[in-house]
């Protein structure tokens, strides 16, 4: 193990870089790292996966991560929020659709009992809330 990776959750190097690139919405860097073998489910030094820290406004980053095997339903252990909660709260319909088509569940509650649709409605994202209601049959 390289010295700089000691004490880090599994991943370290390229997984840390992947999470960083995803958080910045750097599509080409994300693609390069994934093609070079970065683990799409590896965690950064904060214990977060790239799909959890990705720039929610970049549906293309989400697509790349998911195409390479990122888990769309990974939850934050403290808050139980999933990427769909984040996309709904911030109003990123394109990213939400990508996550949903990749198998993300829309019927899961966070630690406060809120569904993604609740977060979209709280923030006034009518298009997102409408999609979520239609997709869940409400």
Swiss-Prot record:
InterPro entries: Ank_Repeat/CDKN_Inhibitor, Ankyrin_rpt, Ankyrin_rpt-contain_sf
Cellular localization per UniProt: Cytoplasm
Keywords: ANK repeat, Cell cycle, Cytoplasm, Repeat, Tumor suppressor
Keyword ATP-binding in annotation: no
Gene Ontology terms describing biological process: cellular response to cell-matrix adhesion; cellular response to nutrient; cellular senescence; megakaryocyte differentiation; negative regulation of cell population proliferation; negative regulation of epithelial cell proliferation; negative regulation of G1/S transition of mitotic cell cycle; positive regulation of transforming growth factor beta receptor signaling pathway
Tissues in which the protein is found: Isoform 2 is expressed in normal (keratinocytes, fibroblasts) and tumor cell lines.
Principal location listed in the UniProt entry: cytoplasm
GO molecular function, one term: protein kinase binding
A Pfam family recorded for this sequence: Ank_2
GO cellular component, one term: cytoplasm
ANK repeat placement: 13-39, 46-74, 79-108, 112-138
Function (record text): Interacts strongly with CDK4 and CDK6. Potent inhibitor. Potential effector of TGF-beta induced cell cycle arrest.
Record-stated family: Belongs to the CDKN2 cyclin-dependent kinase inhibitor family.
Subunit structure and binding partners: Heterodimer of CDKN2B with CDK4 or CDK6. Isoform 2 does not interact with CDK4 nor CDK6.
Protein name: Cyclin-dependent kinase 4 inhibitor B
């Amino acid at each position: 193990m390289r010295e700089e990776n000691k004490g880090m959750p599994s991943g370290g190097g390229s997984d840390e870089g992947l999470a960083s690139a995803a958080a910045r919405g750097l599509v080409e860097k994300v693609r390069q790292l994934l093609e070079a073998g970065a683990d799409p489910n590896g965690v950064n030094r904060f214990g977060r996966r790239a799909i959890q820290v990705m720039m929610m406004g970049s549906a293309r980053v989400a697509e790349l991560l998911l195409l390479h095997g990122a888990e769309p339903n990974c939850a934050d252990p403290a808050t139980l929020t999933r990427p769909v909660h984040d996309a709904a709260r911030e109003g990123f319909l394109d990213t939400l659709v990508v996550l949903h088509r990749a198998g993300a569940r829309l019927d899961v509650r966070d630690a406060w009992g809120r569904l993604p649709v609740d977060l979209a409605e709280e923030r006034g994202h009518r298009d997102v809330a409408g999609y979520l209601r239609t997709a869940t049959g409400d």
